[in-house]
Amino acid sequence: MKRMMVIASLLLAGGLAYVMWPAENQDRQTASMTTNVSSVMTDVILPEVLSENALIGKRAFEASCASCHGTNAAGQGGVAPPLIHKIYEPSHHGDESFQRASALGVRAHHWRFGDMPAVEGITRGEVTFIITYIRELQRANGIH
């Protein structure tokens, strides 16, 4: 009886560990579930006019972020999530969240794309402009 309890406990612990730390398998799982890896994940309504700072941010985004997060931050299936999404509204992911993610990387916690690495060679100032660009896109899409 004691032996069965030990075996059951080990199986339960192993199952919990698998559920709690799935990040290692996420990239493979997502890639196998995605037929068109570069597909746009959301339609983005563009604002009629971007501020000067947002235009600077757009250029920086295109150079440092778009290869993963897609054109106009629309995301790419199997690669990275859209930033024009309610999850990234300012009340949930404030501006400092973007600063920290770009500087330090971030562990996957909303999406199944795996962890985001730190962005090499980008300054805090450039990220500030990128945030301005993302926030203006978000507002044009009803995310406040």
Predicted regions: what they are:
Residues 29-60:
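Electrostatic cytochrome c docking/interface patches
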Residues 26-27, 92:
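Extracellular/periplasmic low-complexity linear segments
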